[in-house]
């Protein structure tokens, strides 16, 4: 039986323009960094994708190395797309990235034209697609000229393998240089993907200003600080949690008494607002208009429902914003 997409899927979602481009992204996007590799039950991953699309999440964010093993998330997404969403391809924004190690030898990572072109070809094959909507360079390459890396992105757009290009993890000055090169080539950068949350505010120093000046949108990854900005750690470290398992994404030493106190105070404010801490944390990242979308991960449908439900209460009073600043000092 074919998947019957919800006819009301666009009802509760907000779509925000990506910088000065014509592209709009949902305020909440789904990242396939975790929970979509071969270690995950395929039926659960399929259910998450369906749930997301039914709630108006049209943007699915991948990378060549997402798994495990590397490539598995793209393969599984391709299977789900072919089984359920092929009829709605024109309603989807599919993004992928390349920059981290993908195969052995001198051509399997970083930012050479050789690597980026081969990587996207492989990603398209894994997903069964003719093109991706957004293709990112995943991290700056210290050894390859920025002109070569940006020329590779431009080439992939001209070849019809990507509609738009973006950058991830680039610091402000390096991003500015890349934007200028891409503009000269005629393929402007439309989006930047930084790590940004209440507990990771580095982009506020210079990056968000740079994006605004160049008309580039942004999509924040890890907006919940690896799960710390949820109710998961309010009373310590659960045995089945990411921190307890020794995950490199959330180490026990990150859960200091001072940081946990901040999280508890933020949770109290969220409850005053009538929402969960995770919802308030996502809404805070989306405050104003400098962040286009928040990139969530999910292992359960309820997490997607909560994230989309945040949109019904995403605005803050000046007093609430001041309270948050006081807590985060």
Each PLM stretch: what is its role?
Residues 2-12, 142-329:
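Beta/alpha (TIM)-barrel catalytic core signal, keyed to glycine-rich beta->alpha loops juxtaposed to Asp/Glu
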């Amino acid at each position: 039986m074919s998947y019957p997409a919800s006819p009301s899927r666009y009802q509760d979602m907000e779509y925000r323009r990506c910088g000065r481009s014509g592209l709009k992204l949902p305020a909440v996007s789904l990242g396939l960094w975790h929970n979509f590799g071969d270690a995950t039950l395929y039926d659960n991953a399929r259910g998450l994708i369906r749930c997301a699309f039914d709630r108006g999440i049209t943007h699915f964010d991948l990378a060549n190395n997402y798994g495990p093993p590397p490539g598995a998330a793209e393969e599984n997404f391709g299977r789900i797309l072919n089984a359920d969403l092929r009829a709605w391809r024109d309603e989807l924004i599919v993004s992928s990235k390349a920059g981290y190690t993908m195969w052995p030898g001198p051509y399997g990572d970083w930012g050479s034209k050789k690597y980026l072109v081969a990587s996207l070809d492989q990603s398209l094959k894994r997903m069964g697609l003719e093109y991706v909507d957004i293709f990112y360079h995943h991290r700056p390459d210290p050894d390859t000229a920025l002109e070569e890396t940006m020329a590779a992105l431009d080439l992939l757009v001209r070849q019809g393998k990507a509609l738009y290009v973006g950058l991830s993890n680039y610091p402000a000055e390096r991003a500015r240089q890349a934007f200028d090169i891409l503009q000269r080539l005629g393929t402007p950068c439309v989006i930047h993907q930084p790590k940004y949350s209440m507990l990771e505010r580095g982009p506020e120093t210079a990056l968000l200003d740079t994006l605004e000046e160049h008309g580039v949108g942004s999509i924040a990854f890890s907006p919940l600080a690896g799960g710390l900005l949820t109710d998961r750690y309010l009373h310590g470290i659960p045995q089945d949690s990411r921190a307890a398992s020794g995950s490199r994404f959330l180490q026990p030493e990150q859960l200091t008494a001072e940081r946990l106190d901040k999280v508890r105070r933020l949770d109290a404010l969220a409850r005053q607002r009538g929402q969960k801490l995770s919802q308030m944390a996502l809404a805070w990242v989306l405050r104003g208009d400098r962040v286009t979308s928040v990139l969530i991960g999910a292992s359960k449908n309820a997490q997607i429902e909560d994230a989309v439900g945040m949109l019904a209460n995403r605005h803050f009073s000046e007093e609430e914003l001041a309270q948050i600043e006081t807590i985060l000092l």
